């Protein structure tokens, strides 16, 4: 047996072991490949299962969340269903308070749902439905609101003013309903019911005033006819306007009880168009006055009175300084101020047109005309006062000497100034009549008016003529508003004026009596000299002749006014009787045959003088 090398044998054994290891490695590698392949296939199979399982878990959580949401709004949904039934009914059936309360509760439900932002996304349909339900409910509320307001429809204000009745107004229950609805919608700029309120009230007033507007388009029914106080339709329009605006103000206070800050804006929105229309009609009437100032001039005072009333209406309220109204007021003031001077100028022109004195030295047509105008002037006292307060006396006084006026003081206030104007007008009328009488009776002499102490030819006749006209003036003053305008200071001026022309009338009687004032000296024995006796005889003769002539002249005067007749008799008696009695008693025993020179005893003279007053 051949020998085997040990090293070779080790190599053979090692090689054989390596072969076995390689074979085993190949088998392991093959097994691992199979495992890897199987693992890959398993992974692909389990991925969808895991994904599905994940989705199922998410869905489970969503379902659980939904169940939680449904559970949380179960009660809200139940309440909403009940409220929906209420809101679908008529407000008159449900009752306004319950209807509004239900709307508030629905709004609360929506607030709760909106707070649950995640849940709301799943129940958007419920929220949308509730929003639509609220919109319908609020729309019905607006309709109900409008129907409440429309219970008062446009009406003719004149019907109520003629009957002295209040304009229609809402009952307390209706006011409470209107206020409740306004309060529900709250204080917002786009508040729909506030808009409804403002529009409805504005149209109600404008459409009601439209009944009166046609009567504001003319001042008198016929052209070229003087305006009669109170006859213009604009007065009724103003009265209704003031009543309506006052009513709107009261209504706003009544229904905006819980929204006081909204009142001024609401008032302006309603009243501004109404005031605009008023000023437009006012402007139209001012233009009518300007077109015929002679007939319609005094109407400007009435328009001013109306404006003053409107100013009082808006005092302390919005719109109190309305520009259009202030412009109309300024223009009217200018027109009214011109009337004062125009009347004074008219007096001068009217008296200057006299061609001759009345045959009975009586009342002239000029006096009647002027006093008629002055009487009408006095009917607008408040308008005159408003105008004259910014004027001065010099603005109407004509160019006359200061001594012709019965007063020289400067008035301190509007009332005194107005009294002064009327007295100045009466003064100017009388001195103008006197001036014209002097020109007619003494054409060759320059007139000197208002000067009772100067000797003017035919002074008694002039005095009687003016006094006759003053008598009519006094009668008109007493029977008209002139009396209240004049007040005490004006009445005193009229007395002074009357006294001036009584002095005119009594001037010849005064001269007659003054003739008895000449000094004749009697000696201590009571005798007078022959020369002085002749003077006394002459004085008695002149007195007798003058007295008879003056009595005759007096009787030719047709004095029909008892007061004037009494006044003149008293004046003459006071001038003549005491002086004659003193002279008579002093010299009655100076003659052997007194009756030859002394025609009247004091008693006989007094009887004649007293007869003048009968």
Curated annotation (Swiss-Prot):
Superkingdom to which the source organism belongs: Eukaryota
Pfam families: Exo70_C, Exo70_N
Entries under Gene3D superfamilies matching the protein: 1.10.357.60, 1.20.1310.30, 1.20.58.1150, Exocyst complex component Exo70
Chain segments annotated as transmembrane: none
GO cellular component: cellular bud neck; cellular bud tip; exocyst; incipient cellular bud site; plasma membrane
Keywords: Exocytosis, Protein transport, Transport
Paired cysteines (S-S): none
Main location: other
Molecular function terms, GO-annotated: phosphatidylinositol-4,5-bisphosphate binding; small GTPase binding
An annotated GO BP: exocyst assembly
Compartments, as annotated in UniProt: Bud; Bud neck
Record flagged with keyword rRNA-binding: no
InterPro entries in UniProt: Cullin_repeat-like_dom_sf, Exo70, Exo70_C
PANTHER family listed in its UniProt record: EXOCYST COMPLEX COMPONENT 7, EXOCYST COMPLEX PROTEIN EXO70
Protein family according to the UniProt entry: Belongs to the EXO70 family.
Protein name: Exocyst complex protein EXO70
